[in-house]
Amino acid sequence: MPSAKKNLVIVESPAKAKTIEKYLGTDYKVVASMGHLRDLPKSTLGIDIENDFEPKYIPVKDHKEIIDELKKLSKNAKTVYLATDPDREGEAISWHLKELLALSDERARRVTFNEITKKVVTDSINKPRDIDNNLVDAQQARRLLDRLVGYKLSPLLWKKIRRGLSAGRVQSVATRMVVDRENEIRSFNSEEYWLLDAMLESEGSAKFTARFYGKDDKKLELKSEDEVNTVINATKDAPFKVKTVKRGKKHRSPSPPFITSTLQQEASRRLGMTPRRTMSIAQQLYEGVDIKGYGTVGLITYMRTDSLRLSDEALMAAKNYIIDHYGQEYYHGSFRVFKTKSGAQDAHEAIRPTNIELSPDVVRKDLTNEQYRLYRLIWGRFTACQMANAVYDNVVVDVDSAGYVFRANYSEMRFAGYTAVYEEGKDEESDEPRSKLPSLEEGEQVFLEKMLPEQQFTQPPARYTEATLIRAMEEKGIGRPSTYAPTISTITSHEYVVKDGKYLKPTNLGEIVTQLMEERFPDIVDLKFTNHMEEELDEVESGKLYWKELLRSFYGDFSTELEEAEKALDGVRIKVPDELSDEYCDVCGRQMVVKSGRFGRFLACPAYPECSFTKPIVIEMPGKCPKCGSRILKRTSKKGNTYYACERGADCPWRGTAADGSEIKGFMTWYVPTKDNCPSCGKTLFKPSGRGRQKAFCINEDCPEFVPEDKRGYKKKSAADSKAEDKKTAEKKPAAKKKTTAKKAKD
């Protein structure tokens, strides 16, 4: 008797497949497509513009074996469940699978999971639906728009500026935002102002500080030293009396749960994670992690969302958890409901834990350090959003002298509320004096100890960080949750923008490309136009606009601009000026310039070929040298290999021996320093490079938590291996000394 046919479930990734198969049982076979199996060709435009923008999709070559296997499995399957991610991209992948596998509407059923838990997975399988063609059309419209812009504009940039450049509908706008901010900073006219703090003492000899506020209850700013001296002279011999004392309570509410943009912002601020890394770790938490006693568990809901909605089940679970673990007074008293901004897609919930009982402490031992830190952030933010307000006793004291008012503020926590679990990070800290105030009464005389004038100058707007750029893009409607991280990765990898510490700074190349785009393709880099395109894509998704009508409308003006630009720039070659550095050539003393090479940016002498001296750009890493406590710098060898070294170089007391017997002076290692310290010895923890899930480890040989090199995630090279490799190259590669993490690296 032939065996009964199984149902086939297709998801994107093996991790997701593993988690879901555990929930569905033996009647279902769950396999991974590994992403898109059909796409536009890489070598041609792939769009028949004359035939009403008909796309020419082809199978992805690298996935031929997967396609063949899926065809075989689907042919013998009872029903094929297309269970790709619950967004436009996932819907399009499902549609491509249906077309590629030649599935009928009856056999191809669409299921989505906002969270990968047994209840949600089984409920979804029991309630399948048809593929949403509006979602598919919205994704196709975005894909074809991006292909038209990139494929038509990039060759122009290659011919006129430099090979390898690219332009994009969202990336070019993001670059412009960084360039515009830099221009704001350059054109900013700084103005002088002064702060004036009065160091005061009460009758009970308690000292406190009050800052100049104004005169006769009217707020004033001190614009010059003369104005400051006027106040100082007027109050020098005048009495200081407490004018008013205002006491009250201040309530602070928790932040809403995370959406994609706020998760990326907070992970950048609090954890130092790039948006791309944040989304990669979040994907792991969503798809499933092995938790002892629970099996494979999807720990968070879907991470690409701009909705603040929370399910009633999640809200009730939060209520019960807070009351059980913190007490009734820590619960808000009712469900907090947060309003999603207009224009957001409300198909998904906010990002939250799937099971609040799986607290960070419960799952910590089963997670990598990055997974744990990000999960703790998500869990804490969600839990806090349903907790009671934090309550502060607030005191504002105004002290009068000769009609001038000095103000002192102080807040003291009365009830922790949600802050017992979570507090949001800040981009900027306040510089207001916050010294504790003595008990003061109105009319009480206080005594001036001294005046502390301080000259200040107004500051230009700060450069964007990755977090603040994402926030600005979200506020201006540029891109969608799925595009923030790849956009920032693109503009940095193409070196339109570089990181200066935590800030994003445009390069000369980025400014030249932006200038060309503004002059020749103003719509492409116009923020309002780009936002309008996003709104039209939303209309396609809701069925209000036909997707090809959007393409027709866009391409008419775009093709005209393209023709005009090619004519105007015929025979023109645009030179990108060298970017001067603060370093000087060790050989000839000239001011070095920044160049781009195969392995990224480096410093070069401008006198080349007369002088060919080069050196790497120094990038400071988190953590400290385990031997002397100095900074650790990221370095790149001439062959493009990245290593990490103590800033003191040979002056660092660390010593090691290379495979060739030579002495290594100064700490250096292939392992990546992290922000975390060893809980036993306090030294910086390191981890292997790459995207693996290996946990960070201690490299301090005197520490009980020391991890030998052969247990650090990848195989240690032998001296023989290193010498064999040396023969193939003109330069010796760093090699390891036994029981050390350092390897010799030649600059």
Predicted regions and their residues:
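Short acidic, hydrophobic short linear motifs in intrinsically disordered regions
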Residues: 242-245, 254-267, 294-302, 460-472
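Conserved short loop/turn motifs at secondary-structure junctions
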Residues: 5, 85-86, 162-166, 247-256, ...
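C-terminal or mid-to-C-terminal helical accessory/interaction module adjacent to the motor/catalytic core
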Residues: 116, 120-198, 248
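Short, hydrophobic-biased segments on the C-terminal half of alpha helices
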Residues: 279-283, 488-489
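Metal- or metallocofactor-binding catalytic centers and their adjacent structured scaffolds
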Residues: 219-256, 444
